């Protein structure tokens, strides 16, 4: 009798240890091996294990550690699916549902991620228990979740359903093209108007006056002239009654949107779809389907994404950009000195610390955390964008160099052998020519021979050689500069390689 009670205590202790191991706060993900060990232990002794398991699970759900609660919720679902009807009866009790599950939604100190997970578990248990009328408390808990805590339901936590990929019709493509052309035309008209106003103002600009009163009187007249020019400037291509301004709904097209921000997480396993996280900025490239656009993330990944998962990024006005730049300069010039001063005071001797000054500096610095974090995120994204652009540019330059190298190698490989092996013919047999041709074979290799040896008219083929010829060193250096030129020696045509069929067509030297 006492031995049986001791064995039950050991089994209870081992079950509690297994549950604590499966719901340990150091686990970053659900360990299903530990969870299945708990289920096997309860199934081996359902009478004692069920009550003991629910008791330990309830105590773990009452913990303040969010990680323990998340791991325990996963264990609860596994116990409901694998430990039989007794476990389901214990889970679907009013006390357990009310104290361990529904009460989490009213806890303000609990993170919303845990509340979303509790709502997901309630829905999952409701779908599993709804066929059994004896498990009605779980159905009641789900109805209360939908009615009172709808903000935590699974439909709200997840993103909307992705639209179907429908090919765009010709009308849609034509409409998009017309919209793009209209936006470009309006932009061009606005630019022309600005140039016309600027030109008109410069033409009508009065000469500077010496007196201040005349200058003050001239300024209102100039403003009236500018307003009159603006009012009289026609909009030639805009039909009557059509306004250049667009409603926000009409302006959100591929022609006007350049960047969008993700509203939800999207993890896709399709090769052509883009996966992203909530808050990511996507650069729009083109419209692929009716409700799908193609875009790229900051890290360079490219793919298509549904439009109901994103919202357009509003372009900042020049005033906002100027205000943001002023805030950055103030943060770097003034506030950074306060931070350095506070760090210096905190690292100094504690006996000489002025508590009032530290408190004042701390109170001035704490509100800067939001702005500082925003600027850090901004420049972090900018740095990542520039890194991706740099890597893409390096890849393109490398590809271009490879193509150029392959093109040059192919050109050298396919060059005719006659062009590379042909010696440059001449009728004058001089040592200078022979030594130059032996010392500079590459020069002769590059000489064009498009018209063939002996077939060229005129001296165009010989002019290149004489322009590149090195001055001879074997001549008498003491010869008179105005001496009469010696007549060339007569010599017959020299025989060269019989590879060239027209090598014997060269005329004699006297006939050149």
Curated annotation (Swiss-Prot):
Keywords: Endosome, Membrane, Protein transport, SH3 domain, Transport. It is found in: Endosome membrane. One of its GO terms (molecular function) is phosphatidylinositol binding. Disulfide bonds: none annotated. Residues 175-194 form the UIM domain. It is a peripheral membrane protein. Residues 22-153 form the VHS domain. PROSITE patterns: SH3, UIM, VHS. Residues 215-233, 502-512 have a biased composition (Low complexity). This is Class E vacuolar protein-sorting machinery protein HSE1.
